[in-house]
Amino acid sequence: MAASAPQTVGFAISGPIARADLPGLCVRVCALLERTAAGVALCDVSGIVSDAVTVDALARLQLAARRHGCQVRLRRASNELLDLLAFMGLRDVLPD
């Protein structure tokens, strides 16, 4: 018997992200993961600014998702964001 594919949920992050936004962002995404029990979360990052705070936010979301048995996968990431993730050593942590 083949294992079924994990349930997928999607969400988007937009705008510049301030450090003060990180706790609320994590709370909202964790609530979504708890409601859906998804195994994969597709995060549309096409509307974000590629900077260190954004990478910090994405890394925190991945950690929170893993605590819920989920994996965040990036969607519509810019080359600039992918390059920054690679530079910071997090490219494998946040797959697309």
Describe each region flagged by the PLM.
Residues 1-53, 60-96:
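STAS-like cytosolic regulatory interaction modules
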